[in-house]
C-alpha cells in the first residue's frame, strides 16, 4: 500500500493496527501467560515439543496466553480447569489441528487465536463446540479448506483466515450473519466467493493477493461495507454494481490491471481513501473528480501524462501521490488544494511548477526528485515548499533571468592529458608562434603541462548565446580521491579522458571502467563523453582498434552490470512470491526473515539502478591537441550535447534577477579576493541586489545548493559566514592533497620567512634551507611534514604556515579548520572545550594520510583485541560489501564522521580501534583482492551475551553514520549483512551472513534462537542478530559540504 502513517485520517493504513489492538487481551480481565523453559526457538526446526503444566487454582482466569511455546498439544486438564476462560491464545506453536480440549471451553470461549501454527485441518467437532466464539484468528497456517461447521458460529464477528491455502469457502459461510470483519488475503481463491454476498453485516473485507480476475455484478449486496481490500487481485475492470457500495470509506485497488473506472464510480460519495497505484491508467480517472470527500488519493506507478484542472474540486484532499508516472505539467489549480499534507511527484517529467505553489504550506511529506525541473530550479525544489514559495515571491519582485551555464568535469587517470585538453578547449588559437597575455599558444609545439591539483576554469563556449562552461579539471593522482566526489554532481557533463598512446585493453578497468562505476554510483543517469587524447601518437589502424576496444569493453561492462542487477532483482521477486512465514521458517531461504516492506524497498532500489544507467555517448572521440580540426569537432560535440534540453534542463533554469545579481556581487572586487564574508557582509550585498534580510536566506540557500558558494545554515560554527571564494578553497584543498614532501617543506620554509606570497613560484624538487635559515628549524619542519605524510597529523600552527598565502588571520584558520571538519577531511584530536582554539595547542588528524596498515600495538593491550575475547564474549559484526565500486575516500571521511561518537581511538590505514564509553569497537576496510571479490567495510564490537545490548549501543550510531554517508551515492549497489557470532567465535573464514535488512526490523515475537545454516546444529541467540530496537534504515541526510558543493 502506498503512503506513510501520519494523522488520524490515514484510515486504511491504520486499520490493520486497529484490528490487532482490538484483538489484544482486555486489561480488565484476569490474565495468565505461561511459557516453557527454553521455548521460543524456531518451531519448525526444534525436534522436541516442550511440555507445559497448568498451575493449580486457575479456575477464575479469563484470559490464557500459551503462545510462543512450540506446543503440539495443550496442557492436560485445560478444559476442566478453566471454567471461566473467555480468551485463549495459542499463536506461534506447532498445532497441526485444533486440540480437542478446546472443545470443552466452547460454552464460554469468545476469542481464539491459533495463528502462526501448522494447522492443516480444524476438526469439525471442535469447531461445532465453539458456539459462543466472536473472534477467531486462523491466519498463517496451511489450511486447504474450512469445515462447514464454521458457518454455525452464529455469534462470530471477526474472522482472519489470511495466509493459508484456501481455494474456496464453504457454502455455510453465508450463515455468518453477524460477521463484521473478514480477512482472506493471500490464499488461492480463483473467483470472488459468492457466499460472501449474503453477509449483510460485513464492514471490512480483505481478499487481496488472490487471483480473482473479476468481481460479481451483485457485489452491491454488501451495502454495509466500509473498508475493502482488493490489492493484487488481477482485476482488469470493475462492474457497475461495484459503484453501489455506497458505504465505502476506504478502498484498496493497487497492483491490478485497471485502465479505467466506471462512470458510476462517482457515486461512492463517502469514499475518503482510494489507492489506485500500480495499475495501467493513462488518463486521470474523471470519475474521481466529483468525490468531494476524498482525503487520500494514491495514483503512483501508472502511465498518467497530465492532471486535470478540476482536481481543485477535491478540496478535502490531504494526501496525493502521483509519483512514477509520465506527467509533464501540473494544473495551476493544484495550488488551491491548500489542505494537502503529503504531495509526492517524484519520477515524472515536470519542468515547471505552477505559480503560487507556496500556498501549499501545509505539505510536510514532499518528494519531487527525478524531474527535469527548471522553474523553480531543482535545487530550490529539493529544499521544500517554503523555499519554492520564497523563490516564486522573489521572481514576482524582480525580472526573471536565464543564465546558460553548464558544469563540465574532466576526469581520467593520471597523465591522461586532461590539463592539456582543458587549455586547448578553453583558449582560442592564435596564428603563428607563442602568444602572450590573453593571446593563446599555437598548436605546435606544446610545452608539457602538469596538473597542480584540481583546477577550475570558466569557458565561454558560445558568446552569441551566452553559453558558458565551468570546467573542472579533476586531478588523476590517487591522493585527490578523497575530495574528488565533492565535485561530481547531477546536471553536469562528464568528459572521461583516456590516453590512447598508452592505452592497452588490459588497462580498461583502471583507466575507464572504474571511473564509469564511480560516476554512475555518485550521479545515476549522468551523461559521459569518452575522449581519447594523444591521437597523433597512434597509427591509424592502432587508433581505430583502441577506440573500438574501449567501446566494446564499455558495452560489456554495462551488460554485465545490468544482468547482475536483474538477477538480484529476480531473487527479490522470488522471495516476495513466497509467504513471509515460509521465508522466516528456514535460515537457508534467501532474504531469511526480511519483511515484505524491506523486500519491496530493495526491489525498488534495484529497479532504480537499472532505470538510471549512465548515458554514455558513443563513439570514443579521438583528439590530438595539435590538430585544430579535431579540437573544433570536440567543441561542437560538447555544445550540441549541452544544448539538448531533455538531457540538461538546468542549463535553461530561470532565476530571479536579484539572485543572479547577488551571486555576481559576491564575485566583484573588493570582496571577491577575500576567503569568506560574514553573514552581514552578504546581507549588505543583498540590499544592493534588492533583497531584504528576510529574502536573503532563500537566495543564499539556493547559491549553496547549486554550488556557487558555501553557506551552512545548520552549523553553529559556520552559519555566520559565507564562503564565496571557491577557487581559493580549492587551492587550499590542493595544498593538503599534494603528497610531495619537498613541496610541503618548501611552503613551510616560505611561511616561516614571511615569503608566502611566492605561491606562484616554481618549487624546487628538493627543499634545501637557505643560508639565512635556521637548520634546526628546518629539521623540525621536516619532522612535521614526515608526521603528516605517515600519520596524517599536523598541529594548527603548522597548518597556518602551510596556508599562509591564503590565511591572513587566526579567525581565517579557525573557520577553515571547521570547514575541513565538516567536509569530513580531518578532525581535531584535542579540541579545547568551551573556548576557542589555541593555535599551537590543537592537533588535527587527516585519516587519508595514515600509512600504517593496522592501529598501533598499544591499542590492543589489556584484553581489547577482539580475537582474544572469543571465549568470553560474543562478537557483533556488521559488514557492508561493495561488488562494483567502493566510493573513493569513503573510509577516510567515515573515520572523521565517527569521531564524535568514540574515544581512545587508534587509526590504521584500513582499521580503526576505539571505544564507545567502555565498549570496544573496530572499524575495518578490506580492499578487494581480485576482480570477483567485493570491497568490504565492517563495524564490530563484543560483549558477554547478557550485556550484548551494550555492543549494539556501541555500533548502532556508527552504522547510522555510515548510512548517512552512503546516501551521497544514490547509484551505488552495496549489501549489508550481520555476520554469525557463532561462526566468528569458531574462527570461520567464511561466516554465515544474515540479511542486513533485519537491522531495521523488530525482533520476531517469541523467537529466542536462530539456526546458523553453516552448522545446522548450532543456534544463535536472536539478540546477536537483531538490535534491541530497529535502526534507522534511511536517516535524514545531514547537511554537509560533500553533498552540497557537488551540486555546482
From Swiss-Prot:
<keyword id="KW-0963">Cytoplasm</keyword>
<keyword id="KW-0399">Innate immunity</keyword>
<feature type="repeat" description="LRR 3">
    <location>
        <begin position="108"/>
        <end position="129"/>
    </location>
</feature>
<dbReference type="Pfam" id="PF00560">
    <property type="entry name" value="LRR_1"/>
</dbReference>
<keyword id="KW-0832">Ubl conjugation</keyword>
<feature type="region of interest" description="Required for interaction with PJA2">
    <location>
        <begin position="60"/>
        <end position="360"/>
    </location>
</feature>
<dbReference type="GO" id="GO:0045087">
    <property type="term" value="P:innate immune response"/>
</dbReference>
<dbReference type="GO" id="GO:0034144">
    <property type="term" value="P:negative regulation of toll-like receptor 4 signaling pathway"/>
</dbReference>
<dbReference type="GO" id="GO:1900181">
    <property type="term" value="P:negative regulation of protein localization to nucleus"/>
</dbReference>
<dbReference type="GO" id="GO:0051721">
    <property type="term" value="F:protein phosphatase 2A binding"/>
</dbReference>
<feature type="domain" description="Roc">
    <location>
        <begin position="399"/>
        <end position="645"/>
    </location>
</feature>
<feature type="repeat" description="LRR 1">
    <location>
        <begin position="60"/>
        <end position="81"/>
    </location>
</feature>
<dbReference type="InterPro" id="IPR020859">
    <property type="entry name" value="ROC"/>
</dbReference>
<dbReference type="GO" id="GO:0030218">
    <property type="term" value="P:erythrocyte differentiation"/>
</dbReference>
<dbReference type="InterPro" id="IPR003591">
    <property type="entry name" value="Leu-rich_rpt_typical-subtyp"/>
</dbReference>
<feature type="repeat" description="LRR 8">
    <location>
        <begin position="224"/>
        <end position="246"/>
    </location>
</feature>
<dbReference type="GO" id="GO:0035556">
    <property type="term" value="P:intracellular signal transduction"/>
</dbReference>
<comment type="function">
    <text>Probable GTP-binding protein. Functions in innate immunity and more specifically the inflammatory response as a regulator of the Toll-like receptor TLR2 and TLR4 signaling pathways. Negatively regulates the part of the TLR4 signaling pathway that leads to the activation of the transcription factor AP-1. By retaining the phosphatase complex PP2A into the cytoplasm, prevents the dephosphorylation of the AP-1 subunit JUN which is required for proper activation of the transcription factor. Both inhibits and activates the TLR2-dependent signaling pathway.</text>
</comment>
<dbReference type="GO" id="GO:0051897">
    <property type="term" value="P:positive regulation of phosphatidylinositol 3-kinase/protein kinase B signal transduction"/>
</dbReference>
<dbReference type="GO" id="GO:0046330">
    <property type="term" value="P:positive regulation of JNK cascade"/>
</dbReference>
<keyword id="KW-0007">Acetylation</keyword>
<dbReference type="GO" id="GO:0043030">
    <property type="term" value="P:regulation of macrophage activation"/>
</dbReference>
<keyword id="KW-0547">Nucleotide-binding</keyword>
<keyword id="KW-0677">Repeat</keyword>
<feature type="repeat" description="LRR 5">
    <location>
        <begin position="155"/>
        <end position="176"/>
    </location>
</feature>
<feature type="modified residue" description="N6-acetyllysine">
    <location>
        <position position="597"/>
    </location>
</feature>
<dbReference type="GO" id="GO:0034136">
    <property type="term" value="P:negative regulation of toll-like receptor 2 signaling pathway"/>
</dbReference>
<feature type="repeat" description="LRR 12">
    <location>
        <begin position="316"/>
        <end position="337"/>
    </location>
</feature>
<feature type="repeat" description="LRR 6">
    <location>
        <begin position="178"/>
        <end position="199"/>
    </location>
</feature>
<comment type="subunit">
    <text>Interacts with RAF1. Interacts with HSPD1. Interacts with PPP2CA; retains PPP2CA into the cytoplasm and excludes it from the nucleus. Interacts with PPP2R2A; the interaction is direct. Interacts with PJA2.</text>
</comment>
<feature type="repeat" description="LRR 2">
    <location>
        <begin position="84"/>
        <end position="105"/>
    </location>
</feature>
<dbReference type="Pfam" id="PF08477">
    <property type="entry name" value="Roc"/>
</dbReference>
<dbReference type="InterPro" id="IPR032675">
    <property type="entry name" value="LRR_dom_sf"/>
</dbReference>
<keyword id="KW-0395">Inflammatory response</keyword>
<feature type="modified residue" description="N-acetylalanine">
    <location>
        <position position="2"/>
    </location>
</feature>
<dbReference type="GO" id="GO:0006952">
    <property type="term" value="P:defense response"/>
</dbReference>
<dbReference type="GO" id="GO:0034137">
    <property type="term" value="P:positive regulation of toll-like receptor 2 signaling pathway"/>
</dbReference>
<dbReference type="GO" id="GO:0005525">
    <property type="term" value="F:GTP binding"/>
</dbReference>
<feature type="repeat" description="LRR 9">
    <location>
        <begin position="247"/>
        <end position="268"/>
    </location>
</feature>
<dbReference type="GO" id="GO:0005737">
    <property type="term" value="C:cytoplasm"/>
</dbReference>
<feature type="repeat" description="LRR 7">
    <location>
        <begin position="201"/>
        <end position="222"/>
    </location>
</feature>
<dbReference type="InterPro" id="IPR001611">
    <property type="entry name" value="Leu-rich_rpt"/>
</dbReference>
Amino acid at each position: 500500500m502506498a503512503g506513510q502513517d501520519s494523522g488520524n485520517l490515514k484510515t486504511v493504513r491504520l486499520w490493520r493496527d486497529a484490528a490487532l489492538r482490538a484483538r489484544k487481551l482486555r486489561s480488565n480481565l484476569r490474565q495468565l501467560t505461561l511459557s516453557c523453559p527454553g521455548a521460543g526457538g524456531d518451531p519448525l526446526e526444534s525436534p522436541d515439543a516442550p511440555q507445559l503444566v497448568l498451575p493449580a487454582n486457575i479456575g477464575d482466569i479469563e484470559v490464557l496466553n500459551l503462545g510462543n511455546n512450540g506446543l503440539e498439544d495443550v496442557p492436560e486438564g485445560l478444559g476442566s480447569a478453566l471454567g471461566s476462560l473467555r480468551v485463549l491464545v495459542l499463536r506461534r506453536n506447532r498445532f497441526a489441528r485444533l486440540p480437542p480440549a478446546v472443545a470443552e471451553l466452547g460454552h464460554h470461549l469468545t476469542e481464539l487465536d491459533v495463528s502462526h501454527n501448522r494447522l492443516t485441518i480444524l476438526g469439525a467437532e471442535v469447531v461445532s463446540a465453539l458456539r459462543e466464539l466472536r473472534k477467531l484468528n486462523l491466519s498463517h497456517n496451511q489450511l486447504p479448506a474450512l469445515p462447514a461447521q464454521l458457518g454455525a458460529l452464529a455469534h462470530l464477528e471477526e474472522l482472519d483466515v489470511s495466509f493459508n491455502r484456501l481455494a474456496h469457502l464453504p457454502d455455510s459461510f453465508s450463515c455468518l450473519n453477524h460477521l463484521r470483519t473478514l480477512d482472506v488475503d493471500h490464499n488461492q481463491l480463483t473467483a470472488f466467493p459468492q457466499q460472501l454476498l449474503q453477509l449483510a453485516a460485513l464492514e471490512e473485507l480483505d481478499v487481496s493477493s488472490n487471483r480473482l480476475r473479476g468481481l460479481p455484478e451483485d457485489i452491491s449486496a454488501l451495502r454495509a461495507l466500509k473498508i475493502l481490500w482488493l490489492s493484487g487481485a488481477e482485476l482488469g475492470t470493475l462492474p457497475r454494481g461495484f459503484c453501489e457500495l455506497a458505504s465505502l470509506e476506504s478502498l484498496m485497488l493497487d497492483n491490478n490491471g485497471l485502465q479505467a473506472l466506471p462512470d458510476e464510480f462517482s457515486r461512492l460519495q463517502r469514499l475518503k481513501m482510494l489507492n489506485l497505484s500500480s495499475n495501467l491508467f493513462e488518463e486521470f480517472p474523471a470519475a474521481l473528480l466529483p468525490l468531494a470527500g476524498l482525503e487520500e488519493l494514491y495514483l503512483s506507478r501508472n502511465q498518467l501524462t497530465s492532471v486535470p484542472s478540476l482536481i481543485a474540486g477535491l478540496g478535502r484532499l490531504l494526501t496525493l501521490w502521483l509519483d512514477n508516472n509520465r506527467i509533464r505539467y501540473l494544473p495551476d489549480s493544484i495550488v488551491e488544494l491548500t489542505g494537502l499534507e503529503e504531495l509526492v511527484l517524484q519520477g515524472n517529467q515536470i519542468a515547471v511548477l505552477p505559480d503560487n505553489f507556496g500556498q501549499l504550506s501545509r505539505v510536510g511529506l514532499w518528494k519531487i526528485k527525478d524531474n527535469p525541473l527548471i522553474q523553480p530550479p531543482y535545487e530550490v525544489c529539493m529544499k521544500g515548499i517554503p523555499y519554492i514559495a520564497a523563490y516564486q515571491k522573489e521572481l514576482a519582485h524582480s525580472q526573471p533571468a536565464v543564465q546558460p551555464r553548464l558544469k563540465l568535469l574532466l576526469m581520467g587517470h593520471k597523465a591522461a592529458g586532461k590539463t592539456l585538453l582543458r587549455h586547448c578547449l578553453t583558449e582560442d588559437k592564435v596564428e603563428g608562434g607563442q602568444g602572450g597575455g590573453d593571446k593563446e599558444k599555437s598548436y605546435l609545439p606544446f610545452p608539457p603541462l602538469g596538473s597542480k591539483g584540481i583546477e577550475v576554469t570558466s569557458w565561454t563556449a558560445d558568446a552569441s548565446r551566452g553559453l558558458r562552461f565551468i570546467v573542472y579539471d579533476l586531478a588523476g593522482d590517487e591522493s585527490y580521491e578523497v575530495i574528488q566526489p565533492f565535485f561530481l554532481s547531477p546536471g553536469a557533463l562528464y568528459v572521461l579522458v583516456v590516453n590512447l598512446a598508452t592505452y592497452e585493453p588490459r588497462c580498461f578497468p583502471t583507466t575507464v571502467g572504474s571511473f564509469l562505476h564511480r560516476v554512475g554510483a555518485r550521479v545515476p543517469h549522468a551523461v559521459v563523453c569518452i575522449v581519447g587524447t594523444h591521437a597523433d601518437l597512434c597509427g591509424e589502424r592502432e587508433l581505430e582498434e583502441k577506440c573500438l576496444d574501449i567501446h566494446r569493453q564499455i558495452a560489456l561492462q554495462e551488460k554485465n552490470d545490468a544482468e547482475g542487477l536483474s538477477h538480484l532483482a529476480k531473487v527479490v521477486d522470488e522471495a516476495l512470491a513466497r509467504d513471509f512465514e515460509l521465508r522466516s521458517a528456514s535460515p537457508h531461504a534467501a532474504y531469511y526473515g526480511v519483511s515484505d516492506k524491506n523486500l519491496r524497498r530493495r526491489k525498488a532500489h534495484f529497479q532504480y539502478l537499472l532505470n538510471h544507467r549512465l548515458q554514455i555517448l558513443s563513439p570514443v572521440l579521438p583528439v590530438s591537441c595539435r590538430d585544430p580540426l579535431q579540437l573544433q569537432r570536440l567543441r561542437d560535440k560538447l555544445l550540441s550535447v549541452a544544448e539538448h534540453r531533455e538531457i540538461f534542463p538546468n542549463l535553461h533554469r530561470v532565476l530571479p534577477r536579484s539572485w543572479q545579481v547577488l551571486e555576481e556581487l559576491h564575485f566583484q572586487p573588493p570582496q571577491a579576493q577575500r576567503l569568506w564574508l560574514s553573514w552581514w557582509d552578504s546581507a549588505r550585498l543583498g540590499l544592493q541586489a534588492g533583497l531584504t534580510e528576510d529574502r536573503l536566506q532563500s537566495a543564499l540557500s539556493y547559491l549553496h545548493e547549486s554550488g556557487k558558494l558555501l553557506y551552512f545554515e545548520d552549523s553553529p560554527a559556520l552559519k555566520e559566514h559565507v564562503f564565496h571564494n571557491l577557487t581559493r578553497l580549492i587551492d587550499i584543498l590542493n595544498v593538503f592533497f599534494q603528497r610531495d614532501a619537498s613541496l610541503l617543506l618548501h611552503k613551510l620554509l616560505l611561511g616561516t620567512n614571511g615569503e608566502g606570497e611566492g605561491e606562484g613560484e616554481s618549487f624546487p624538487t628538493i627543499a634545501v634551507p637557505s643560508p639565512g635559515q635556521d637548520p634546526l628549524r628546518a629539521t623540525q619542519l621536516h619532522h612535521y611534514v614526515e608526521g603528516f605524510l605517515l600519520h596524517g597529523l599536523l598541529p594548527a600552527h603548522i597548518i597556518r604556515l602551510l596556508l599562509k598565502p591564503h590565511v591572513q588571520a587566526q579567525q581565517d584558520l579557525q573557520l577553515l579548520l571547521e570547514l575541513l571538519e565538516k567536509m569530513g577531511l580531518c578532525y581535531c584530536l584535542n579540541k579545547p572545550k568551551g573556548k576557542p582554539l589555541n593555535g599551537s595547542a590543537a592537533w588535527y588528524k587527516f585519516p587519508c594520510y595514515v600509512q600504517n596498515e593496522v592501529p598501533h600495538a598499544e591499542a590492543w593491550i589489556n584484553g581489547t583485541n577482539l580475537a582474544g575475547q572469543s571465549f568470553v564474549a560474543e562478537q557483533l559484526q556488521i559488514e557492508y560489501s561493495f561488488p562494483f565500486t567502493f566510493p573513493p575516500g569513503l573510509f577516510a571521511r567515515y573515520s572523521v564522521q565517527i569521531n564524535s561518537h568514540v574515544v581512545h581511538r587508534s587509526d590504521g590505514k584500513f582499521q580503526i580501534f576505539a571505544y564507545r564509553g567502555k565498549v570496544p569497537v573496530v572499524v575495518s576496510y578490506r580492499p578487494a583482492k581480485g576482480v570477483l571479490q567485493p570491497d568490504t567495510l565492517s563495524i564490530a564490537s563484543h560483549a558477554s551475551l547478557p550485556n550484548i545490548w551494550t555492543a549494539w549501543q556501541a555500533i548502532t550510531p556508527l552504522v547510522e553514520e555510515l548510512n548517512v554517508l552512503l546516501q551521497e551515492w544514490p547509484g551505488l549497489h552495496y549489501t549489508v549483512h550481520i555476520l554469525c557470532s557463532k561462526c566468528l567465535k569458531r574462527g570461520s573464514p567464511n561466516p554465515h551472513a544474515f540479511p542486513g535488512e533485519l537491522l531495521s526490523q523488530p525482533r520476531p515475537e517469541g523467537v529466542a534462537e536462530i539456526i546458523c545454516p553453516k552448522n545446522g546444529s548450532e543456534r544463535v541467540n536472536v539478540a546477536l542478530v537483531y538490535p534491541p530496537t530497529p535502526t534507522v534504515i534511511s536517516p535524514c541526510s545531514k547537511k554537509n559540504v560533500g553533498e552540497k558543493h557537488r551540486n555546482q
